């Protein structure tokens, strides 16, 4: 009697998980680090796990189910850790409908989506399906088999119920029928009913009280009845499921009535006993008459009939209790011992996360935002200090300090100028600047080409998508490329803006270079040439040891100390490192969301508060020193002898000092620009890879969608058949009855029966046909046979009956036909009939029209009878 329903597994196409995940890991984590290598190995293991779980047929045992559960747990674990989407990590998963068997012109229905939620739903479906198959394979004659079956049916019910609640939110479009909410909801109820049936079998085996067994059976009957009601009006499950559900409903109801009748007998309610046994017998009779192909209830039927016969006999001879109507009986109670097992990840008890140390995407995004805030704070503080240093150098250069207090002889190069000259020469001089400026346009052009190529890929794919959308209209059901590419195009626009600003910055650097190139060239010359290029002046009166010179030297020394302190502060700002991962993870665990701004600002104030205070103090200290230097320099200028030669010399020295500052700034800016372009190249290459990956994924999705569209178009019914013209329906000059409509092509051809004996050969016109010729049963009024043309030869065999025959039942014996002629070829496939083949004068007639004949000989085909 026990017939259990199990679910077929869905089939999928192979997907390489490792390649896109490894790309993301390499772009996200530092190159060459142990962390990156570990995650790359984990991605390879994940790809192997998918192949083991869904890429091959699975046996019906616990080990195969454990592999499926491990894969499901793993994809649930990585979902928050990787940005799976159509425009980031784009993985297209293709799954076939588990219940669709395909058609003549195409395979089974399948759906391809770039959604990890879709993959999760399909894998969980397979977990439930395999659990149902394992449960159905159990030996229910022992407690262990009953226990395993009940556990797996309840798990399958919970898994199907989980899919019902989550599938629509996980997918961006309608799912296939097998994972639609209606279908999985029905499957969940079927699995729950079978779990209840297992508990009923357990109670029966343990010989529990009949009242309890009756309640368990009645509850199982309700579950089966509800499942049957849900699916009988929807063509979603295989057809063989419906009769099994109906039979199980009746059988469980009969069991409930049977055990309740035993309870009634114990309570001396003999009339109720008979009424319940009669109802049980009727239910089992219905099952035996309608569903005997699916379930065997002979033993149970005999058991009920024996009990009913004994009860009637005892009641008729002893008790004489009135047999009540069924509607007057008290309803049987219900007791459920099953419930759908909720899906709580991890499901597998042996699960180990391959990416255990990887943080969720929300934490990664918060860390990226925190690092950006940190970089902004550090860069802002460093920029303030560098601007202050540049300002100080500019003020000193305009005052010709410290060269003014060093140049007392008027005919030698001041020591500060010599130091700056040696520094310029050591850094490569003007040749370094020339080389760096020459490289900038090449770097810029390379970046532009990468960006243009990336956007070209998007443009081409979008144009193709638009063309196909215009061609197929509403059939083209996927996200439009122009919507999908909006983030990428915004990113590309941002890169374009960055390049435009870089071009402007390059122009400013070149302008500065042209303005100060000659002075920098002079600063690169040897000391004798440099000294010769500087105008000499009359020896100034000795001011060494004067108070104003000593004050200036002290102020300049303090300013140098401030500059050195800034270098230390800059290093301190760059070296501070604090990992916010733990704080973000704690916030995510406690609140479910991360308030990144509040957490980051608080932590940055704590870590960098002291350093930023020192930066502001350094700026204020420099401001005071520069004011004092300017005041002291005014006094120094008044004391210094003034003449034209001295003024000209001082101007040249100022220009040389300014040239040094400009050289340092140019080299720094050019190196920064080169570094910027090289780093931008890496970013643009990643952007190009991202564009290339998504375009490739879209092309793959497009090909799958086109294939599905072709199959769906092929499955669509063709145009209505053209009605047969009137002149083809009967021979000329006759009114023979219309032949029966040929069988539809979906009906298997009926095996032909031996035909009736044919009538005797047609005699000459002066002799009548034999009145004793046999007539086939059911034939209509025969049309007169065509008269024999005088002088023509008689036919080589008996003429066939001049009346139509029904499909599959030819009414005449096969006679020699023209080469290639097959009178059954078109009739088997319901093809339209061409015009009647007219006979030539003097030609022996063909048999009467069974079906319209053919205008030309057809290729040889296999007929029902061998050709003679």
Swiss-Prot record:
Pfam families: ALIX_LYPXL_bnd, BRO1. The modification N6-acetyllysine is found at residue 215. Residues 503-868 are annotated as: Self-association. The keyword Cell cycle applies. GO terms for molecular function: calcium-dependent protein binding; protein homodimerization activity; proteinase activated receptor binding. Changing residue 512 to A: No effect on interaction with HIV-1 p6; impairs rescue of PTAP-type L domain-deficient HIV-1 p6. One of its GO terms (cellular component) is membrane. Residues 864-868 are annotated as: Essential to promote virus budding. Residues 418-868 are annotated as: Interaction with SDCBP. Changing residue 806 to A: Abolishes interaction with CEP55. It is found in: Cytoplasm, Cytosol; Melanosome; Cytoplasm, Cytoskeleton, Microtubule organizing center, Centrosome; Secreted, Extracellular exosome. May be phosphorylated on tyrosine residues by activated PDGFRB. Changing residue 319 to F: No effect on rescue of PTAP-type L domain-deficient HIV-1 p6. Changing residue 498 to D: Reduces interaction with HIV-1 p6 and EIAV p9; abolishes rescue of PTAP-type L domain-deficient HIV-1 p6. GO terms for biological process: actomyosin contractile ring assembly; apoptotic process; bicellular tight junction assembly; extracellular exosome biogenesis; macroautophagy; maintenance of epithelial cell apical/basal polarity; midbody abscission; mitotic cytokinesis. Disulfide bonds: none annotated. CDD domains: BRO1_Alix, V_Alix. Residues 778-791 have a biased composition (Low complexity). Its main location: cytoplasm. Residues 176-503 are annotated as: Interaction with CHMP4A, CHMP4B and CHMP4C. The modification Omega-N-methylarginine is found at residue 745. Keywords: Acetylation, Apoptosis, Cell cycle, Cell division, Cell junction, Cytoplasm, Cytoskeleton, Host-virus interaction, Intellectual disability, Methylation, Phosphoprotein, Primary microcephaly, Protein transport, Secreted, Tight junction, Transport. It is linked to Microcephaly 29, primary, autosomal recessive: A form of microcephaly, a disease defined as a head circumference more than 3 standard deviations below the age, sex and ethnically matched mean. Brain weight is markedly reduced and the cerebral cortex is disproportionately small. MCPH29 is characterized by small head circumference apparent at birth and associated with global developmental delay, impaired intellectual development, speech delay, and behavioral abnormalities. Affected individuals also have poor overall growth with short stature, mild dysmorphic facial features, and seizures. Self-associates. Interacts with SH3KBP1/CIN85. Interacts with PDCD6 in a calcium -dependent manner. Interacts with TSG101 in a calcium-dependent manner; PDCD6IP homooligomerization may be required for TSG101-binding. Interacts with SGSM3. Directly interacts with CHMP4A, CHMP4B and CHMP4C. Directly interacts with CEP55 in a 1:2 stoechiometry. The interaction with CEP55 is required for PDCD6IP targeting to the midbody. May interact with PDGFRB. Interacts with SH3GL1 and SH3GL2/endophilin-1. Forms a complex with SDCBP and SDC2. Found in a complex with F-actin, TJP1/ZO-1 and PARD3. This is Programmed cell death 6-interacting protein. It comes from Homo sapiens (Human). The gene is PDCD6IP.
